[in-house]
Amino acid sequence: MAERKIKRALISVSDKTGIIDFAKSLAEFGVEIFSTGGTLKKLIEAGIAAKSISEITKFPEIMDGRVKTLHPAIHGGLLAVRGNSDHEKQAAENNINFIDLVAVNLYPFEATVAKPDVTFADAIENIDIGGPSMLRSAAKNHKSVTVITDAADYQCVLEEMRANDGATTEATRLYLAKKVFALTARYDGAISNYLEKISQTDESVLPNHLSVSLTKEIDMRYGENPHQKAGFYAMKVGEQNLSFDEFFEKLHGKSLSYNNLLDISAAAGLIEEFRGAEPTVAIFKHTNPCGVAQADSLETAYRKAFSTDTQAPFGGIIAVNRPLDMATAKAINEIFTEIVIAPEFEEGVLEYLMKKKDRRLIRQLKALPSSALEFRSTVCGLLVQDKDAKTATKEELKVVTKRQPTEAELEDLLFAWKICKHVKSNTIVYAKDMQTVGVGAGQMSRVDSSRIARWKAGEVNLELKNSVVASDAFFPFADGLIAAAEAGASAVIQPGGSIRDEEVIAAADERNIAMVFTGTRHFRH
């Protein structure tokens, strides 16, 4: 039972890539081929002796092709257990011939609904019924039936047939059957997600049902710690199709670890805030920025970012918003950096940076999606939310103090605000002249975050006088604002919304500090 010779095949594909060569090869093995609609026409035009499925069903295709393979003669031929005397007797009594191979792919539902001008009628017509039914029947009976959904598998099936006198092995049939059930699950999920989306009346809430398809893209040696198993999975949910290879290309270095991918995601997310801006460099460690700067050149921006914290960048991650030039590469090379992310690398830079074999070099291929769903596992389920893609403009800022911020302060405030969104809460970011000069991350108390930011600035002798401060959430008391003023800050940006806002504003006015509210909180847990 391990090997099963293929005598009769059913081919019906919407993606006709490679189907002619595959069918010709099957014919060379003496396989009898049946087909439907456009596939049948294409096979006959290529000189292949294919027959209509109607010769099996003795029933014409009807209702614009909606009904053609949903027939006992088809599914009996697929589902009959070979070697089962009752099944074989019933098949003979009903003139049902066994079908040994099915090559089917489905109507392009996902591609159809992704079109901006798709109509509901078009979407419905691209819901495949007969295809999934045949695939599931064949996959259920994979001990006897070879089922192919992917043109990439044609060649391996043919090679196995050549090696086994026209037969396939049970191991291969099981492998192909697993692909079928993964495909049909994803296909049904895409239909469900689409129907949820178009019937949703309240856009402020997420759908009641959400189907997510995950496909392993990277095997990892371990997870966050060596005792944890891990892998990276590409994700398909609705129109959101996310995979590492879609957005990034690893050009050099060892395989990426679990922690590497977390850091790449964090660093790329922050540098995306500065797409199209002046040369900007972000240095990350453990998913937090330890230094960010913008300047006239990438090299200057890197050196300013590095000066924020001269210890944390060792073994860190660097992301830039411009093609990486040699001057910046040489500056980066002064210490060990584990990962460098850039949209491009200028001539000679890759070869220069590749001299350190343990360094990972990553090319970012395109912009990250501005709207996407984010998922977070908990001990009892999955949290889902929209991506925090909101930013602030000068026009949206509300000045709440007597003193207006200067133009230079406004630039620094907006710069710091973009950064604090990407720092673990509670977050305080000091910035001056488009450079972070102190970052306080992840503290339970906002005042403690401010103290850490001040202490870090002092460690590297960075001047906080006339700096600006960004806070990811409101100051619950005036003490956070007072701490910033005592450090030398001249302007503050924060969401506002505390019941003690007036106390905080009064404290700012007493110290001649300009303060603006954004009306948006940026917690990051």
Swiss-Prot record:
Q: Which GO terms describe its cellular component?
A: cytosol
Keywords attached to this entry: Hydrolase, Multifunctional enzyme, Purine biosynthesis, Transferase
| Biological processes, Gene Ontology terms | 'de novo' IMP biosynthetic process
Q: Where is the MGS-like domain?
A: 1-149
Q: Which domain of life is it from?
A: Bacteria
Give a GO molecular function annotation for the protein. Answer: IMP cyclohydrolase activity
The keyword Transferase appears for this protein: yes
Which first-to-last residue range defines the signal peptide? none
Q: Which InterPro entries match?
A: AICAR_Tfase_dup_dom_sf, Cytidine_deaminase-like, MGS-like_dom, MGS-like_dom_sf, PurH-like
Q: What is known of its domains?
A: The IMP cyclohydrolase activity resides in the N-terminal region.
NCBIfam families noted in UniProt: PRK00881.1, purH
| Similarity comment text for this entry | Belongs to the PurH family.
| Name by which UniProt lists this protein | Bifunctional purine biosynthesis protein PurH
User: To which species is this protein native?
Assistant: Chloroherpeton thalassium (strain ATCC 35110 / GB-78)
Show the taxonomic lineage.
Answer: Bacteria, Pseudomonadati, Chlorobiota, Chlorobiia, Chlorobiales
